Amino acid sequence: MSMGRSSSTTFRNRTASHGSRSLGSAETARIPRKLSSQLSHTHANILHPQLQTMMEQWQMRERPSLETENGKGSLLLSSEGVADMIVLSSFGEVISVVFPWFLANVRTSFDIKLSEFKHQLFEQIGPMKWGKHSTQPQDYAFRQLNNFGEIEVIFNDDQQLSCLELHGTFPMLFLFEPDGFNRDKELMCDISHCLGYSLDKLEESIDEELRQFRASLWTQTKKTCFERGVDGVDHYAFPEEQYFCVGEKCPTDLESKVKAAKLDYQLFWTKRKSEANEVWEKMYKITIDFDPEFNPQSLMRMFVKELQCMNLFDPEDPPDEEWILQLAGRTSFVTRPEISLVSYDGIRSELESYRCPGFVVRRKSLVLKDYVRPKPLYEPHYVRVHERKMALDVLSVSIGTEVKHSGNSDKVWTDFRPTASLEQITLWDLDSNLMIRPVNVTGLPFTASHDIYLGMEFKVYVGTLTLATIKIPRVPTTKLVWKREFFTFDLYMKDMPPSAILSVRVYSMKTTKMKEEIELGWVNISLSDWRDELRQGQIKLNLWGPEPSANRSRIGHNGAKIGTSLSVTVEISSHGRRVKMPNEAQYKYLVDHRISWSDTVEIVGDDYEACIGDPGYKKLQDLVKKHESGVILDDSEQRHVWSWRNYIQKQEPDLLVVLSELRIVWTDRENFSELYVMLETWKAPSVAAALTLLGKRCTDRVIRKFAVNKLNDQLSQFNVHLFLLPLIQALKYEPRAYSEVGMMLLTRALSSYRIGHRLFWLLRSEICRLKDCATNNEEYRRISLLMEAYLRGNEEHIKGIIRQVDMVDELTRISSLVKGLSKEAAREKLRDQLRTISHKMESIDSPLDPVYKFGEMVIEKAIVLGSAKQPLRLVWKNKNPKSDLHLPFCEVIFKNGDDLRQDMLVLQVLEVMDTIWKAANIDCCLSPYGVLPMGEMIGIIEVVPNCKTIFEIQHKAGLVNTAARSVDSNFMNKWIRKQCGFVDEKKKYKKGGGPTVDSAQATKKYFESVDRFLYSCVGYSVATYIMGIKDRHSDNLMLTEDGKYFHIDFGHILGHGKTKLGIQRDRQPFILTEQFLTIIRSGKPVDGNSHEIQKFKTLCLEAYEVMWNNLKYKFQKTLCCKGETKEKARKFFAGVYEEAFNGSWSTKTNWLFHAMKHY
């Protein structure tokens, strides 16, 4: 660097009266050659009025300056002393940079990035430091004068100076210290930390569609944050305990159980100072008798009355202090006056398990300090950039040719491109068939040869239906040239569905084996783009590598070139104008004014009884079964199903899944237009049917939007978390970045912290699987932008999320360190590592469920389990008050090397079933423990306390004894009796006596345990049969000390079990052994006609019937819950039960061999 030198200097204050330099002086009037083409002729010699005013105000400020002998202002620089100009490049242009306290002319190359330009400037002006102004470049941002005469902030420091719009008689940039700018930078840094990837790099890789998507996400974030609760118990983060339904009365069976066990409510209270300091050791206990009519307010009134009777009060409490109830051991509250206490899930579970519900009485004013009103959202820089771009495009359109619109041409997206001035038509204005031609193929995985030919297949499909197919003539790989002619599909453009997908498959063949095709790659793309316009012209597509056809539902090309570098360029015939897809108004117009109607007799569907009595109804049922079995219906059969569309719309809305897979619907615009119009008044389908419509079987955006809207109406804030995993999978089948599924997930996450917390980790585990191809992978970028929007709307909790992310990173590192070590060495290594970093993992929300708070880590209990992946078992103290009544310790298993998504899905289905049964007043005592995937093959599993596997129970010293226990029908019953306090009669105590046993108390505990086992066995028997859970053995069946039975490890579901020599190992429909039946009979010999066994059978049938009634999705019944009517369903499962009851010998044999193998 060099700069012009001057003579002696004086550093002093001066104002405008001391000969300050004019900003419009001749010295600064040079215009960079590179920018000359950008300057407006009208602004060449006239300074902008707003800029002139700003400069006049700036010149009247008090500021420092240097004066030389000739009186000219100068700069005091770090490297060269005094100079009149900062020279960063000898051959650059001159630009004026206005600092907050002085002005400097700078000669620089316009190829330099703004970040580097700013850094070099501040390296030079260190001696010019003045007053409170910082000289750190990161504290400043640039501003410039834009095309509209506005001073705007430049947020992207990675762009070059040549990209800026510098106007006026000379180019100028302004530096300022923004208040919100640093906040945005810090927030972006925090979000990058949470994502595990830089937002700056992500911004560089997103295209126009993703920029629009990002702006739409921000709009939805702002709208949701404005509408969500932010005060008191309505705060979006306030943890209200899940409840079943409003106005529900206490079930009779539950009331009888509570009275028999003499259960009551236990409330704990402490002084204000102790509560404020979170000191819970000394608490007063008040017991209140159970009343099935109690709600939170009535229980609270009883508590206050008891408090007054005991003369307990705190003088520090104000007279108007309000109280709320917190469940013992959980950050979960019960506050709703319209909800009875027995309707709350946590309270109901305690009562069903013969435990007294415990509450901590909290002061509302202290509790709500943790749920303050969030600070206003800070509008991110990309929103202002996007709005500016839209405004510029509007200006471009306004000075162009007026846009010609055809009738009813409402736009799906507001289009502000300059090309919007081109004439626009709709798809229905075209009078031709779809035409495509191949252009070239690159990136072949082999050397070109005269003996190898290349072929290409084009297919247009919707959902599971192929509408048209063309195979292109093969050409030698040495000359990959096709004739310049288009191939015409048998698909009339007017009848092409708006969500039609083009599939391209490339294959090779050898001249010696011309009948054998070797697939090289494939790709699917929507024939309409994100603006809802028909794709036209040449398109280059990166192909995906060969996969089974069942996995080819992915829409979008392989931007990251995962697995293959093969790409193909195709050309879709152009029509000289922009072609929009039809819109809602056009569909309605066509349906109202169509000329011809189908000759098929239509069923109105209003009278249900008349419809099911129609002979055609039986045929409809048969055709639905035929369709679901995989048989393709012929045209006459499809027309029969279609003729029942009005009945289906009003009476059996789930059959929309079948209608959406009829070919006659998607090959005639009259039919799919009518279906679209009918959706406006379509009865809501079941949750199961809506989720099916969001899977890969349906690609139509109108139907998918309908499914999301109906699903959103049916899911409450308390059960939506059960469906997050399938909804995230549904994102992968969306043809465009913007989707109703994504917007629904974002809205729900921002409206409930608990839902958002789980969604964050599920989304993060998805992007971790794609991190190796991050910037070029469309799925990665979509999910990352969705996560960014959530984190921007959840800024209050982002620091807590960062702590959890850091915890996962540390545990991943430690799990890698202990792999391969012996059991003892691995345990010591784990504990040594935890001693140095455990403080980082304490006083933090549990990633599994934020209602639990990790307190102090119990390092002495940390172990490395002996399985192949060597998972870590970690223990924390539960930091919530009175955790000893519920869960004293939070125990988790951290796994590195297993995909936990299938386990999580099965456990969520179990949780859904549990909710359905409880709503029907059947508590099956299920134990759907928590599982959370947190990265690529990384996740955590909740440990159910005080339990053992059946193998651990039967395991005894010596192989013979262990094998003997496997066939002993009483060994599990003996173990339960021991946990209840009974002493094994065969073990005699030595003289002096043994422990005294309270026989009555032990008997009471034993019968309670038997009751828990009975109901949990009912639940898991029915649930595992419905889901087809296989590979059941004594190492994945668990038993708790209080009698609950449950399953773990769900690697084989939907009937896909292990086989040996072609023979299915699991030959029973569900596990029902003699050991189980012995417990059910309280230790007595098994008798199928006994009262206990008959009760068990009746409960199984009732549980199955409840599930049959709730699985309204008919075709799912053919897979899981068989039986056309309730009577037939009950009869069917009675046969299943008898098969399991009579086949217990096979399970006993499996357990024997499993014990001998793993002893």
Swiss-Prot record:
**Pfam families assigned:** PI3_PI4_kinase, PI3K_C2, PI3K_p85B, PI3K_rbd, PI3Ka
> Known catalysed reaction(s)?
a 1,2-diacyl-sn-glycero-3-phospho-(1D-myo-inositol) + ATP = a 1,2-diacyl-sn-glycero-3-phospho-(1D-myo-inositol-3-phosphate) + ADP + H(+)
Q: What class of enzyme is it?
A: transferase
Q: Name one GO molecular function term.
A: 1-phosphatidylinositol-3-kinase activity
Record's Gene Ontology CC terms?
A: cytoplasm; phosphatidylinositol 3-kinase complex; plasma membrane
Domain PI3K-ABD: residue ranges: 79-179
Quick one: where's region Catalytic loop?
1028-1036
| GO BP field | cell migration; dauer larval development; phosphatidylinositol 3-kinase/protein kinase B signal transduction; phosphatidylinositol-3-phosphate biosynthetic process; phosphatidylinositol-mediated signaling
Region of interest (Disordered), ranges: 1-28
All copies of the PIK helical domain together span 607-793
Question: Domain C2 PI3K-type: where?
Answer: 430-588
Region span, Activation loop: 1047-1073
**Could you tell me the keywords of this UniProt record?**
ATP-binding, Kinase, Nucleotide-binding, Transferase
Per UniProt, the ranges with Polar residues bias are: 1-25
CDD domains assigned to the protein according to its UniProt record, in alphabetical order:
C2_PI3K_like, PI3Ka
Q: Where is this region: G-loop?
A: 864-870
Asked if Translocase is a keyword of the record, the answer is: no
Membrane-spanning segments: none
In this chain the PI3K-RBD domain maps to 272-363
Record EC number: 2.7.1.137
Q: Which PROSITE patterns does the entry mention?
A: C2_PI3K (PS51547), PI3_4_KINASE_1 (PS00915), PI3_4_KINASE_2 (PS00916), PI3_4_KINASE_3 (PS50290), PI3K_ABD (PS51544), PI3K_RBD (PS51546), PIK_HELICAL (PS51545)
Q: Which family does it belong to?
A: Belongs to the PI3/PI4-kinase family.
Function, please?
Phosphatidylinositol 3-kinase homolog that regulates longevity and diapause. Promotes cell survival during embryonic development by recruiting akt-1/2 to the plasma membrane through the production of PtdIns(3,4,5)P3. Could function in the development or neuroendocrine signaling of the dauer pathway. Mediates susceptibility to enteropathogenic E.coli infection. May negatively regulate AYI interneuron neurite outgrowth. Plays a role in aversive olfactory learning when an odor is associated with food deprivation.
This chain's protein is named: Phosphatidylinositol 3-kinase age-1
Q: Which organism is it from?
A: Caenorhabditis briggsae
